[in-house]
A protein has these predicted regions:
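Bacterial N-terminal signal peptides
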Residues: 9-17
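C-terminal cell-surface addressing/anchoring modules of secreted/extracellular proteins
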Residues: 25, 828-832
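Structural signature of tandem-repeat unit edges
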Residues: 36-45, 54-72, 82-95, 105-118, ...
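Consensus positions within tandem repeat domains that build extended binding/scaffold surfaces
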Residues: 75-77, 97-102, 120-125, 143-148, ...
């Protein structure tokens, strides 16, 4: 769980680092190039380094570039320079920009000149190898997350010039054992030493004007705030001193030794994530003086079984107790007006909750996935219940919706154990999936006040047998009753202004759309009435009795998932009037053996025929220009298919796992083959890729175990990740001169491949590109190659010698990696 917490925090930090809004083109300063440096000119005609493009390991940045003195290291200037081990910055530099050395994984030492005054946010973020850094006397501020994730940083000396230390500046510096805060520091952000695993000592002079340590814990004296409780402290209990008014953001975060904490009556606020991930903490009493509990304050305290919230508290922050999975009950005090988003979500042991009359709003996902919660009384004061507020509360059997509620939010009550629900007359709208998955809900009354019902609002309510749509409903999303397996009756008055039922099926009259065909109808065939122009999304979803459907010539579109999971449907004729087949339109129609697609259709949606396991053949008309992602994925009976000349692209996983597909014709019109397009087509013995194709996606032909040979056309420039991985029968492959890169694992585990000629022009061979090619005996590498990934030829048991050009980069690589090699000079290579 702690690893998950770390990963979550790391992801949040990374996203924060990368989410700087891009400047518009006119705002971007002109960049100049000098050797391996790109730079911009400042107002005083000095240079700010914008980007280093070299690959040096030990680097001394020059004093000048094209005669301009270097005075600044710009934002992200050296970010992700993985080869950089040490850097010396010239004396004229005064500022280190945001993310300047971000993720320089190999950087072990950095010397900052005396003139530097500011170290930007994320400046040395994730420099995992950085063991020491000297901060000169001129530095006044250290930015947010400046040395975050510098795990090897064992010591840091802060000079007397520093006045400001940013939020989480030394977060996760796992080797740091002690730190001294100089008297000059007057401002400190949220816990700068968060999760410093070995930090046991924070030193502050007794005369410090702002900060103090008491029993090793860092406080802000002027604000009377607890800033940091050292992560490595081993004591199991702690009492916060009297007089402290606030607990800072993440002050105790991840202090896993603590089982109990005593908070004095002087404390009025608990900061964001103040006790986050204190996983040994079993109980806590919040004193009457506290008025606010911050976002994520106790999330996730996985051992917390009880918490006392006093009446003084008026707000409970977002995620305040999220994932406190041992918490069994909670009483929200009078005075609280809102329950934040995710406030108690994932509290899996929570059995009861008391919500007072003062509460007016319950946030999004506030109690989501509280799987032990059996009963909730929502007071009449509540006027807003957020999206997913009680979703996946699988034990919740009943709940009252107060009269003040005007809308039921999306997925608000996806509660499996609901048996009945009363929707008050105040409600005007029912959101998407509002009661989705309420499997035991046998009946529901929609009041006359409701004007709109969202997509799948009552989807998969499998005990629902009938429903009445009041005349007030004028707007209805895609099949609100999709997957209701026992629904036999939808009741609509003859005078309804918008909707009507014909032979039990629900229609939208103005739109001439079939909205819902009840799942539990027992007839095996159905003819859609003439005049209907569209079949709505999931209109026939999970209608397992239907074997045949007649679609009239008036229909022009078939919606997404229209016939999803119609497992008895054996055949269907699509009329010439239809122009589009929606995503997943016939998904999992496992009995569908044949289908005729008319010339009027121009696109086949994503997953349109996915998992139609009985579909043996299909003709795609010349009108179709694109085949969507997963369009025919897992059509395991499909033996052959002809793609017409009109098609220009084959989507990702379009024919994935079509295990019986033995042949396919790709026309000259196709320019791209998507990722995994023919992945695991185990019967595919041959395929001709036309010259028009310029890109072959990742894993496009992986695990095509019968494929014996392949010719890659001249227009292709790169072979994607795992493109032909595990093609066990592949004995020969022709790579054209247009290819410049061979992706990671591109031909990995091609056990029958005996030789490969890599053409001149290829510059990179990816990690594991030919790994485990057991029969590979001959490989020639041209002079153009400048990069060979790890394990590119690993576990090639027959490969004894590589053929390389004398004095080439590949020859040096062979020497460095202990590979046997023989020479062919560049002239011989060109003759080949």
């Amino acid at each position: 769980m702690k690893k998950l917490w770390y990963l979550t925090i790391a992801l949040v930090l990374i996203l924060a680092a990368l989410s700087v809004p891009a400047a518009t083109a006119e705002e971007e300063p002109t960049q100049y190039t000098s050797g391996d440096y790109r730079y911009t000119l400042r107002l005083d005609e000095t240079a700010a380094i914008a980007k280093y493009t070299g690959s040096a390991s030990e680097l001394s940045i020059p004093d000048t570039l094209d005669g301009h003195a270097v005075t600044a290291i710009g934002d992200k200037a050296f970010a992700s320079c993985g080869s950089l081990t040490s850097v010396t910055i010239p004396d004229g530099v005064t500022s280190i920009g945001n993310s300047a050395f971000y993720s320089c994984d190999s950087l072990t030492i950095s010397t900052l000149p005396d003139g530097v005054t500011t170290i930007g946010d994320y400046a040395f973020y994730s420099c995992n190898s950085l063991t020491s850094v000297t901060i000169p006397d001129g530095v006044t501020s250290i930015g947010d997350y400046a040395f975050c994730f510098c795990r090897a940083l064992a010591s840091i000396s802060l000079p007397d010039s520093v006045t400001t230390i940013g939020d989480y500046a030394f977060y996760f510096c796992g080797s740091l054992t002690s730190v001294t805060i100089p008297d000059s520091v007057i401002e400190m952000g949220s816990n700068p030493f968060l999760e410093c695993d070995n930090l046991t000592q924070i030193m502050v002079s007794p005369d410090h004007p702002v900060f103090a340590t008491v029993d090793g814990v860092l406080f802000n004296k002027s604000e009377k705030k607890l800033v940091c409780y050292p992560y490595a402290f081993t004591q199991t209990s702690y009492t916060i001193p009297d007089g402290i008014r606030s607990i800072g953001d993440r002050a105790f975060s991840s202090c896993n030794a603590l089982t109990s904490i005593t908070i004095p009556n002087s404390v009025t606020s608990i900061g964001n994530c103040a006790f986050a991930a204190c996983n040994a903490l079993t109980s806590i009493v919040i004193p009457n003086s506290v008025t606010a509990i911050g976002d994520g304050a106790f999330s996730p305290c996985t051992s917390l079984t009880s918490v006392t919230i006093p009446n003084s508290v008026t707000s409970i922050g977002n995620s305040a107790f999220e994932n406190c999975r041992s918490l069994r009950s909670i009483i929200i005090p009078e005075g609280v007006t809102s329950i934040g988003d995710n406030a108690f979500s994932l509290c899996r042991s929570l059995e009861s909750v008391t919500i007072p009359d003062s509460v007016t709003s319950i946030g999004n996902r506030a109690f989501s996935s509280c799987i032990s919660l059996t009963n909730v009384n929502i007071p009449d004061s509540v006027t807003s219940i957020g999206k997913n507020a009680f979703s996946l509360c699988t034990s919740l059997a009943n709940i009252n919706i107060p009269d003040g509620i005007t809308s039921i939010a999306d997925n608000a009550f996806g509660c499996n154990s609901f048996t009945s629900i009363t929707i008050p007359d105040s409600v005007t709208s029912i959101g998407d999936g509002a009661f989705d998955g309420c499997n035991f809900l046998t009946s529901i009354t929609i009041p006359d006040s409701v004007t709109s019902i969202g997509d799948g609002a009552f989807g998969d309510c499998n005990s629902l047998t009938s429903i009445t749509i009041p005349d007030s409903v004028t707007d209805m999303g895609n099949n609100p009753f999709a997957g209701c397996k026992n629904l036999t009756r939808i009741i609509v008055s003859p005078d309804h202004p918008v909707f009507a039922t014909i032979d039990g099926a629900l229609f939208n009259k103005p739109e001439k759309k079939l909205v819902c065909y009840p799942c539990a109808f027992s007839q095996t065939s159905y003819a859609i009435p003439d005049g209907i122009t569209s079949i709505g999304e999931k209109a026939f979803g999970s209608c397992s009795a239907l074997k045949s459907i007649t679609i009239p010539d008036s229909v022009t579109s078939i919606g997404d998932g229209a016939f999803d999971s119609c497992k008895s449907l054996t055949s269907i004729t699509i009329p010439d009037s239809v122009t589009s087949i929606g995503d997943s339109a016939f998904y999992w129609c496992t009995s569908l053996a044949s289908i005729t697609i008319p010339d009027s259709v121009t696109s086949i949606g994503d997953g349109a025929f996915d998992s139609c396991t009985s579909l043996a053949s299909i003709t795609i008309p010349n009108s179709v220009t694109s085949i969507g992602d997963r369009a025919f994925s897992r059509c395991t009976s499909l033996t052959s298919i002809t793609i017409p000349d009109s098609v220009t692209s084959i989507g990702s996983s379009a024919f994935h796992s079509c295990k019986s597909l033995a042949s396919i014709t790709i026309p000259d019109s196709v320019t791209s083959i998507g990722d995994g397009a023919f992945d695991s087509c185990k019967s595919l013995a041959s395929i001709t890729i036309p010259d028009s194709v310029t890109s072959i996606g990742d894993r496009a032909f992986s695990e095509c175990t019968s494929l014996a040979s392949i010719t890659i056309p001249d227009g292709v420039t790169s072979i994607g990740y795992g493109a032909f991985e595990s093609c066990d029968s592949l004995a020969s492959v022709s790579i054209p001169e247009s290819v410049t890169s061979i992706g990671n694992r591109a031909f990995s585990s091609c056990e029958s491949l005996t030789s490969i000629t890599i053409p001149d022009g290829v510059t990179s061979i990816g990690d594991g590109a030919f790994k485990s090619c057991d029969s590979l005996a001959n490989v020639s590498i041209p002079e153009s190659v400048t990069s060979i990934g790890k394990y590119a030829f690993a576990e090639c048991s027959e490969l004894l010698t590589l053929t390389v050009v004398r004095n080439s980069w590949a020859a040096s690589w062979c020497k460095e990696n202990g590979m046997n090699y023989t020479y062919t000079d560049a002239l011989d290579w060109l003759k080949q």
